[in-house]
Amino acid sequence: MKVLVISDIHANIRALDTILREEADYDLLCCAGDFTDYGISPREVRERFRQLKNTVLVYGNHDRHVINIYESGEWTNVADGKYKWVHYNCERLSEKDIDWMKQLPEKAYFEADGWSYGIAHQYDNGYGTVESRYAFDQYWNASYGAECDGKRRLIFGHTHRQCIHTLGEGMEWINPGSISYRRPDDANRAAGFYVLFW
């Protein structure tokens, strides 16, 4: 089985389509949110995900921000010098697109390859990371319940920084990075994603 793990598309349909072509034989696609904002193709990205099968998707902070700005209507009358990517994205999205994002969960759980997985866009309200087994257990139990006693992996996006962090036997968290936009201090300009095989 092959699981494709991605995050932080930010309305970049070219990057998304490139990854989907390269990894077309995936069995399950997991996306840790941020489908919108900063890019030019929010509707196309939303439509692509609607067409895909076998997905586990959660919303990200930028998706929530786009929803809030869209529903407030403030994107329809933006003062000079205040126009941002969020307004650009709102202009290109329909009520149907917004409804699709609104139905995405904040967190999701699934099982694959003998592991239990929890997926969310971000670990905390900032750019924090899971630093200890205790913090991992606290987060897992609060988010997914304490009854899982086997191998567990958490998937986060948000930071645009790719990593795999092993806290001990059967306890890992991963961040695929962003398929679209790297942080300015990251010399690696390649798209970030992970492929899990078993």
Give the positions of each predicted feature:
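Beta-strand-turn-beta hairpins that frame and shape the catalytic cleft
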Residues: M1-L4, Y109-G118, G168-E172
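Active-site-proximal segments of metal-dependent phosphoesterases and phosphodiesterases across multiple
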Residues: T76-D80, G114-D149
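Conserved beta-sheet core of the metallophosphoesterase superfamily
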Residues: Y134-W198
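Core catalytic region of metal-dependent phosphoesterases/phosphodiesterases
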Residues: K2-K102
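Glycine-rich phosphate-binding loop signature in dinucleotide/nucleotide-binding domains
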Residues: E22-Y26, L52, A112-D113, E147-G150, ...
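Histidine-centered catalytic micro-motifs
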Residues: S7-I9, I119-D124, R152-Q162
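Short, well-ordered alpha-helix to beta-strand connector turns
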Residues: Y26, L52-K53, L104, K151, ...
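Hydrophobic/aromatic beta-strand patches that form the interior of the parallel beta-sheet core
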Residues: C30, V56-V58, G118, I155, ...
